[in-house]
Amino acid sequence: MKKNVEIKKLGINGEGIGYIDRKIVFVPGALPQEEVIVEIIKQTRTYSEGKLLQVVKPSKDRVTPKCRSYDNCQGCTMLHLSYFKQLNAKKEAVRESIRKYTEYDLSRTIFKDVIAAPSQEGFITAVNLPIVDFKGKISFGIYQRDSKYLTLMTRCFKQHPIINECLLKLEEILTTNKCKTYSDKFRTGLRFLKVKLIDNKLQLVFITGRDWLKEEIVKEISQLPHVASIFMSVNTSKHQEFDELGYSKLYGATRLELHDDKNQYLVSVKSKLPENIEMMWKQNQTIKSSVQDSQKIISLNCGIGLLELNLDQEIVAIDEKRYQIDDAKLNAK
C-alpha cells in the first residue's frame, strides 16, 4: 500500500516521523519538512512503518551520503542529513529520551549544543567485525538487522585509512592461504576480527574455532605495515563475550602505548577504547572543565583511566571489569 506522507520530525533512531489518518508512521531515510511516497510494510494498532520510495519535496538539509552502501547498510542512520543538522537532531534525541523515559523536569536543565567532531571521516580507530565468505573470498562485514544483506567493511569511509588498508591486505592473505570461515557444525574456522589502532600501531585479535591460525599465516600478517601485535582466542560457544576466555599472544607487544599531550597510557588486548579517540580527548576536556568546583569525584565505568588520570581532584574510580582496573593501576603509577 503506497501513501503520501508529510514528515513532521525525526525519531530518536533517526527515522522520519509522519502521520496517516492520525496514526504515527516511521519512515527511515526521510527528513522533516519533506513530502515522501512510502510503502507501508508494517502496521500495528498504534503505529505503522513505511519504506521510502520517493522524495517528492526534499528538505534543504538533505545531502548525498558519501557511503556507497548507505541505501542498504544500517550502520549509520543520518548521513543523508547535513552534519550540523545531525548535531541538532542528536541533542533533541537526548531531550526526547529523557522526557519519554524519565520523570525528570526538563525545565531545570539547559541543553547545550552538541560539540562537533574534529573530523567526519576516518575517525574510527576500533572495530569488531565478523569474518565472512563473500563470493569465494574471505572478507569482513556485518549482516543487517532483519535481513540477509551483507555490508563489507573494508572500505568504510568512517574507519581510519590504516584500518581499511589492513583489512584489504588481510583479505588477500587469508584468501590466498585458503582459510575458512567459522562452521557451527565442525566448530572450526575464522569467526571474528577485533582491531585497535593506537598511535598508528595495530593490535589484531582473531577469534577462531578449534583449529587456530597457522604459524606461517601469523608470520605473514605480522609483516604488514603498522601491525604491532597479534592475539587469538578459541571460542566455539554461541555467545560473543570473547574476553572471558582470554587471549593467546601470537606476535608482538603485550600492551600498546597511547599518548596524549602530557601522559602515556598502556592498553592491553582486553581493555576497551572508544572508537573515536580524537573526540574522547575533547570530551575529557569538557568534563574536566565541568567538575572544577568538585573536591572528590566518583567515576563509574572508568575503563583504563583516560579521563580520571587527567583530573586534579581525589578520584574513586570503579569498573566492573578487572582487566580495566589492572590497566588503570599501571597507568596511575
Provide a role label for each language-model segment:
Residues 1-69, 100-105:
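Terminal RNA-binding accessory module
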Residues 3, 9-12, 16, 212-333:
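Rossmann-like S-adenosyl-L-methionine
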Residues 33, 159, 276:
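Short, conserved phosphate/pyrophosphate- and ester-handling motifs at nucleotide-, phospho-/glycolipid
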Residues 37-39, 128, 298:
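Hydrophobic beta-strand signal
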Residues 53-65, 72-186:
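Extended interfacial segments that mediate partner engagement and assembly in macromolecular machines
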Residues 182-197:
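A short glycine-rich, hydrophobically flanked beta-strand micro-motif that places a catalytic Asp/Glu
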Residues 195-209, 264-268:
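Short, aliphatic-rich beta-strand segments
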